[in-house]
């Protein structure tokens, strides 16, 4: 059997493996479909993650250096690529009561022919309803961060909303904002194909940031007022600068991206200073949730799964391209790393 592994920075390969015996609380899944994570995972793949030499210390709530003799946060050769899998249970441990052999499930896991997952008190291992879409299922993770971004920005009926970056998170945020009652939804992305999809699913306008004063265009489209909410998913300094320029007085930027380091030139002394801008950093998996105890990571996940499975959210167009597992190393390097403009969220079939 084979699994997709990062053997070196920016190098993916299929590597042979043998499954261990499952524990009493586990199930083994034969994977049929899967998808990688195009945001934080590719940062790891490029060896650009702070987690390589540092760890986020929960006690101090800050990054601290890893001890010199401790394992690195990412070890190439062992680093398995992939985020979500859909497949069929082929083996159950003796303590597993909520699942049975033959069940079709979705869960967190790497791109490999089989995945072993805890199946006792694990709500994250989801049963696939009859006839449900695997493409919607593998968007379970990005949907959570999109929902968190929309909720943390307090999008309300009638708001002018802008979503910057139309990858999977941004595309889902477009749908959620429109369905939440936003009167004008604007997408921002330089890739025409992504903009076409956003328009099909709720965007009233799309802007190409290349050669465009995005902030001024947002003001123009909203009668000079600006956006009540801007959801920033791209992580680029220019995008945040434009968002501050296009934000309405007292508006909110929901910063969802795991940002790249900003180069010299980013300026908080212009529109941000005069327009009482608010920036909220949004991360679905940071606990406690801003709306705790009413909302938690679990409630976000439960809600997203329901919306994905009942068709409220439509992610069929987002899984593009779809490649075979046999071709996944080359496809990962091309579509996820080297040419991300050629994809939104890559799907994998086994």
Swiss-Prot record:
Cofactor: Zn(2+)
Cofactor mode of binding and number, as noted: Binds 1 Zn(2+) ions per subunit.
Keyword match NAD: yes
Family the UniProt entry places it in: Belongs to the zinc-containing alcohol dehydrogenase family.
Alphabetical list of SUPFAM superfamilies matching this protein: GroES-like (SSF50129), NAD(P)-binding Rossmann-fold domains (SSF51735)
EC number: 1.1.1.-
Molecular function terms from GO: metal ion binding; oxidoreductase activity
Enzyme class: oxidoreductase
Function statement: Catalyzes the NAD(+)-dependent oxidation of the hydroxyl group at C3 of D-gulosides leading to 3-dehydro-D-gulosides. Probably functions in a metabolic pathway that transforms D-gulosides to D-glucosides. Is also able to catalyze the reverse reactions, i.e. the NADH-dependent reduction of the oxo group at C3 of 3-dehydro-D-gulosides leading to D-gulosides. In vitro, can oxidize D-gulose and methyl beta-D-guloside, and reduce methyl alpha-3-dehydro-D-guloside and methyl beta-3-dehydro-D-guloside. However, the actual specific physiological substrates for this metabolic pathway are unknown.
Superkingdom assignment: Bacteria
Name of protein: D-guloside 3-dehydrogenase
Lineage: Bacteria, Pseudomonadati, Pseudomonadota, Gammaproteobacteria, Enterobacterales
Catalysed reactions, as listed in the record: a D-guloside + NAD(+) = a 3-dehydro-D-guloside + NADH + H(+)
Keyword terms of this UniProt record: Carbohydrate metabolism, Metal-binding, NAD, Oxidoreductase, Zinc
């Amino acid at each position: 059997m084979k699994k997709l592994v990062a053997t070196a920075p920016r190098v993916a390969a299929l590597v042979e493996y043998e499954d261990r015996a499952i524990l009493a609380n586990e199930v083994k899944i034969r994977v049929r479909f899967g998808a990688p994570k195009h945001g934080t995972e590719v940062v790891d793949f490029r060896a650009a993650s702070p987690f390589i030499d540092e760890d986020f210390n929960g006690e101090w709530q800050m990054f601290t250096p890893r001890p010199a003799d401790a394992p690195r946060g990412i070890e190439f050769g062992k680093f398995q690529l992939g985020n979500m899998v859909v497949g069929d249970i082929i083996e159950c441990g003796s303590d597993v009561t909520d699942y049975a052999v033959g069940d079709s499930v979705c869960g967190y896991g790497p791109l490999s022919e089989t995945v072993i997952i805890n199946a006792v008190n694990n709500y994250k291992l989801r049963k696939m309803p009859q006839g449900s879409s695997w493409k919607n299922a593998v968007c379970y993770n990005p949907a959570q961060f999109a929902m968190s971004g929309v909720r943390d920005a307090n999008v309300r009926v009638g708001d002018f909303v802008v979503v910057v970056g139309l990858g999977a998170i941004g595309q889902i945020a477009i749908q959620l904002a429109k369905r939440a009652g936003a009167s004008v939804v604007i997408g921002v992305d330089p890739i025409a194909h992504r903009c076409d999809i956003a328009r099909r699913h709720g965007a009233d306008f799309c802007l190409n940031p290349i050669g465009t004063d995005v902030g001024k265009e947002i003001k123009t489209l909203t009668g000079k007022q600006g956006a009540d909410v801007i959801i920033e998913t791209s992580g680029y300094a220019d995008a945040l600068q434009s968002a501050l320029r296009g934000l309405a007085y007292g508006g909110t930027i929901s910063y969802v991206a795991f940002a790249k380091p900003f180069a010299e030139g980013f300026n908080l002394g212009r529109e941000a200073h005069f327009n009482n801008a608010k920036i909220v950093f949004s991360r679905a998996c940071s606990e406690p949730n801003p709306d705790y105890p009413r909302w938690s990571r679990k409630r976000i996940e439960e809600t997203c799964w329901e919306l994905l499975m009942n068709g409220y959210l439509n992610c069929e167009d987002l899984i593009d391209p779809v490649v075979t597992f046999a071709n996944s190393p080359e496809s990962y390097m091309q579509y996820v790393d080297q040419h991300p403009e050629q994809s939104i969220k890559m799907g994998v079939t086994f």
